[in-house]
Design a protein with these regions (language model features):
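Epigenetic methyl-mark regulator signature
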Residues: 1-257, 262-367
Length: 367
C-alpha cells in the first residue's frame, strides 16, 4: 500500500462522497481539471479499483448511486471535458475511470445500466419531486406543477429562517411552494409559511446597475405588475430566480433562493402603443449573506442530474395529458424561450464589452 492510502483509512460517508463528486464534476466542466480535490478523488478511485481487483469491495451499490460515482466516471471520460494538450496525469485518470467503469458494469450488470431510471423513479418517492403533481390548468403552460394538499404543515418562523440559506435550490416553483418559502406556485409576491414576503423572478429581465443594485423589468397586464410591492418599498424580501429569467444571475436550471433584497424603488406605467404595462423594480442585495459568487455555483452537477431526470418525467406527463401534438407544442415553447434568452445573453455581453471600451457607453445604452 502507498502511504497516501492506508488500508485502515475509513471511506467518506456517502454524503461527503457526493459533495466531493460534485466539486470534481464542477471543476471538470469549468476548468477541464479535477480541481482542488484531485488527489483525494484519485486516491479514492485507485482504492476502489484495487478493492474490485482483490474482490474486497468496500463501496456498495447504494453509495455509488447516491454519490453519482457513475456520473463522475462518465464526466472524466467525456471528450468535452478533456484539456488540450492532454497532461499525462489526466490520461492516467481516464484509464483509471475506464477500468473502474468496466469493473462496476461487470459486477452490478443491469443495476448499473438502469441507474438513471431508478433515480428518475425515486424523484417522486421522497426525492426532489415529492408531494407535487402535474396539472394542466396552470396560468403558465411552462409551469405545470402544483403542491399536493396532503403535505402542508405549518412550521415556526425560526425554523423557516434556518431552513433557507441563499443557494437553496428546487426543480420548480411548486417544489419551493411545498417547502414553504413561497405561498403559491405562481410567479407573484407572496408570504410563505414563515411570514416573509418572497418574490420569484421567473420571467422578464434583470440588469446589474452597480455594487449590490439590480434593476428588474417585466412587461404584461396590470395583474402582472406585482402592485402589492408598492407598499413594500424600503423593506426586505426574499428573491428567488428561475432559469427562464433573462439575467446573468439566473440559475442554469430550476429555481434558486438568492437571499434577502431591499426594494429601493417600484414603478409601473402603461405603454399606450402596445397597451402593455411595464414594471421596474430596483433591488439591493442585503450585505452579510453568502456571496452571489458562491450562490451561483448552484445548481450543482448532481442537481442538474435531477433536473434532466425531471425534464424527462415532465415531457412524459405532457404527452400523456395532451398527446404528441401537445408535447411538440410544449417543446417548441421551451425552445423559443431558450433562443430568446440566448439572443438576450449575446446582446448583453456585447453591450458590456462596449461599456468597457467606451467608458460607460453600455450603461447609457441599457437605460
Amino acid at each position: 500500500d502507498s502511504p497516501s492510502t492506508p488500508a485502515a483509512e475509513p471511506l467518506p460517508t456517502k454524503e461527503q462522497l457526493l459533495e466531493l463528486c460534485d466539486s470534481v464534476r464542477t471543476s471538470l466542466r469549468h476548468s477541464k481539471s479535477l480541481g482542488p480535490h484531485a488527489d483525494r478523488i484519485q486516491s479514492l478511485l485507485e482504492r476502489a479499483l484495487k478493492d474490485e481487483l482483490n474482490h474486497t469491495q468496500s463501496l456498495d451499490f447504494e453509495t455509488l448511486q447516491y454519490a453519482r460515482l457513475d456520473k463522475l466516471l462518465t464526466d472524466v471520460l467525456d471528450p468535452a471535458h478533456r484539456p488540450s494538450p492532454l497532461p499525462l496525469r489526466f490520461r492516467a485518470d481516464m484509464a483509471l475511470c475506464e477500468s473502474l467503469q468496466k469493473m462496476w458494469r461487470a459486477r452490478f450488470r443491469d443495476q448499473y445500466f438502469s441507474l438513471d431510471q431508478v433515480r428518475q423513479r425515486s424523484l417522486s418517492i421522497g426525492g426532489e419531486m415529492r408531494d407535487i403533481h402535474f396539472t394542466a390548468s396552470g396560468m403558465d403552460p411552462l409551469e405545470s406543477w402544483a403542491v399536493s394538499n396532503s403535505c402542508r404543515d405549518p412550521i415556526s418562523e425560526l425554523e423557516g429562517n434556518q431552513q433557507f440559506e441563499p443557494g437553496h435550490w428546487w426543480l420548480n416553483l411548486a417544489c419551493a411552494h411545498r417547502d414553504g418559502v413561497i405561498g403559491t406556485a405562481v410567479e407573484k409576491p407572496t408570504k410563505g409559511k414563515y411570514g416573509i414576503t418572497a418574490l420569484p423572478l421567473l420571467t422578464g429581465r434583470e440588469e446589474h446597475i452597480r455594487g449590490n443594485l439590480y434593476r428588474y423589468v417585466r412587461e404584461g397586464r396590470l395583474s402582472d405588475m406585482h402592485v402589492s410591492l408598492l407598499t413594500r418599498v424600503g423593506t426586505q424580501i426574499r428573491i428567488l430566480r428561475g432559469y427562464r429569467l433573462k439575467s446573468t444571475l439566473a440559475p442554469h436550471a430550476g429555481v434558486r433562493y438568492d437571499g434577502l433584497y431591499t426594494i429601493r424603488q417600484y414603478g409601473n406605467k402603461l405603454d399606450a402603443a402596445t397597451d402593455k404595462y411595464r414594471l421596474e423594480l430596483l433591488l439591493e442585495r442585503v450585505d452579510g449573506q453568502k456571496s452571489l459568487d458562491e450562490v451561483q455555483q448552484v445548481p450543482l452537477p448532481s442537481q442538474l442530474d435531477d433536473w434532466h431526470a425531471f425534464k424527462k418525467v415532465e415531457a412524459e406527463m405532457v404527452r400523456q395529458r395532451k398527446g404528441d401534438d401537445g408535447l411538440l407544442d410544449f417543446k417548441m415553447r421551451k425552445e423559443e424561450e431558450r433562443i430568446d434568452r440566448e439572443h438576450w445573453r449575446r446582446a448583453s455581453e456585447f453591450k458590456a464589452s462596449l461599456g468597457q471600451e467606451g467608458c460607460g457607453l453600455g450603461l447609457i445604452m441599457s437605460v
